[in-house]
Structures are given as C-alpha cells and as structure tokens.
Regions:
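Surface beta-strand/loop "capping" patches
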Residues: 231-273
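Residue-level detector of alpha-helix initiation sites
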Residues: 24-26, 69-71, 163, 203
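FAD-binding core/adjacent interface of flavoenzyme oxidoreductases
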Residues: 1-62, 139-146, 157, 184-185
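A conserved FAD-binding loop/helix module that cradles the flavin
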Residues: 199-244
Length: 318
C-alpha cells in the first residue's frame, strides 16, 4: 500500500489483509447540472453542516434546500435553530429520500414545507444568490411549464445524494456493483480480491452510523481471521440477485460454508410500498417470506436468512 500523512510523509506499507473504509462524498451542483447563475451561497448540506457546527459560521439567513436526504433534513432543523428562515425543501422524487423520523422532527415540527416532485430550474444572483425558481416535474422528471414558483433566498443547500469513494477500489481491479456504486462483497465483507475487505459507505450508503459500525466490526473480524487462517477453503458460492421492487443488495455473494448460523442481507426498495412481503426464492421455490407494513427507498431494509435455508439452494442463486 502506498500512503502518506503529515507526520511520516510518503510511505510504503505491507500487510496480509486490507480493509477499504473510504466512505463517500456528496454530490455537488456540477454533478446534477442545475441551470442558472453561479453566485456564492450554494453549498452541499455537509459543507454547511461543517461551517455551522464546527467552524461556527452562519451560511445564510434565508434558505432553500434541494433534496430530502437525511443530512439536508437535519440541516433544515439546524438552520432554523440558528435563526435562519428555511422556506422549503424541494425533492425531485414523489417520495422523500430521508428517514421518516427526520421528516417529522426536522420539517413538520418546524413548519417547513416539503415540495415533492419539484426541482430547481434556475438560480439567479450576481455576487450572492438572490432568487431561486422551482418547478413541478412530470413522471419523466422533466419540468412542467407554467408551474414555476419563485423563492427570494440567499442560500441553497444541496442534499442530492452521496457517492461512495471507490477510486482505489476500481484501480485495484475489484468487481463493482452498479446498483450500489460499491464493490461486490461476500458474507464476510471480502471483495473479489482475496484478502481485501470493505465496509461502511464505501460499500453502500447507510442510513445510520450504527449500521456502519456493525458492518465495519464484521469486516475487521473477517480480515483478522483471514490473516490467521487464510482464504476460505470451500468457495462454493450463492449469488443474491435483485428481484422486483428491490435494489442494492449487500452482500451480493454468500459462501454457505463460511456462514455460522445466519446471514444478514440489506437492501433498499425501488419505490414506496405498503403491506408487502419480501420473498426469498431459489429455482422457483420460496425459501422464506418477510412481511413489511411499509418500505421506502429512503430507509434501508434488512432480512436475516438462516443457514438452513441456504443449504436448500440448488442452482447457486437466490
């Protein structure tokens, strides 16, 4: 591994195992191509969070938030508590991409309106943001003429998604999953490269740091076992595929011989669903079913598959 830091400068390190924990970065204005002027006053929600919470700077007095990700929702509340006027939260999708509790605690409790199926179509201003135009969008996410709304604000916060930092992962030739924008991992968080493990937001974007911590502990334990015992001898593998209505499954591969009692599978719904069942099938046979009263893309789901069910898989795929 080639690395560098302030204390030691450039270094070359050798190890029997590597854990990738690079996290993710925020999607910026340039990444989503918002039209309009380029004045000061447009921040990612995470950058604004740092300015307010750590640096002690107020980023604006009248704020509009684009996107309903959790960081944006939390910053809506934070800006309100700091004395700013948050005029609204604008979301392109017909549903929120944040946790429901954040919608309630950060928007509803502060009377901040949420505009679903809307987006910013113009930002106006000379040196500083002065006005933002918001339009309703159709089913193809295209602005609908005649639905424009004007907001006189001096600040725009962007909460429009996170991108896993996988430049190192790709350069190592590790197999990637387009659905998660992260590496394909086994049940023990090992990637397609022997001895290289990954966890946290570099694998897939999590809702809570609690999930990141648990996943990272699993990766750390697995890396230590690899150093001690070497690669798993039985490489017989089951592929876990996305079915109708679900996306971003992790782990994507499971080696039953490496599973003790159960395997936890995490994923997101493709849309908002109520009173549904998550079914695990192999070769047309239903192995397990899990009921859910509500599922939404903004909330990660988890099911637990017992090892006994994995032993019933015949075609190497569920």
């Amino acid at each position: 591994v080639h690395a560098m830091n302030k204390k030691n400068g450039y270094m070359k390190l050798e190890g029997k195992s590597i854990i990738l924990n690079m996290g993710c970065r925020e999607r910026t204005r340039g990444a989503i191509a918002i039209p309009g002027d380029r004045p000061a006053g447009v921040f990612t929600a995470g950058a604004a969070q740092r300015y307010v919470n750590i640096e002690g700077y107020m980023v604006g007095k009248k704020v509009l938030i684009l996107g309903s990700g959790d960081i944006g929702l939390i910053m809506a509340r934070r800006m309100s508590l700091e004395g700013a006027k948050v005029v609204g939260c604008v979301e392109l999708c017909p549903y929120s991409n944040g946790l429901n509790r954040n919608i309630v605690q950060c928007l509803n409790d502060y009377d901040i309106p949420l505009y679903l199926s809307h987006t910013i179509t113009d930002i106006q201003g000379d040196k500083r943001v002065e006005k933002v135009i918001v339009s309703k969008v159709d089913e193809k996410n295209q602005p609908i003429p005649g639905t424009e709304m004007e907001f006189d604000v001096d600040t725009v916060l962007l909460s429009v998604g996170l991108i896993p930092e996988n430049e190192l992962t790709r350069s190592a030739g590790i197999t990637m999953d387009p659905a998660t924008s992260g590496p394909v991992v086994y049940e023990n968080m090992e990637t397609s490269a022997e001895g290289i493990f990954a966890s946290g937001n570099v694998v897939h974007v999590h809702d809570l740091v609690d999930f990141v911590t648990a996943e990272s502990q699993k990766a750390g334990k697995s890396a230590a076992e690899y150093v001690k015992n070497g690669e798993t001898k039985d490489q017989t593998c089951i592929d876990i595929k996305n079915g109708d209505g679900v996306n971003g499954i992790v782990p994507q591969k499971v080696r039953p011989s490496n599973v003790d009692k159960k395997v936890e599978v995490m994923f997101r719904a493709r849309n908002v669903f109520t009173d549904v069942a998550i079914k695990v099938r192999s070769n047309g046979e239903e192995l397990a079913s899990f009921k859910r009263e509500h599922m939404a893309p903004g909330e990660m789901e988890k099911i637990v598959i017992p090892k006994a069910f994995l032993d019933k898989v015949e075609n190497g795929e569920i």
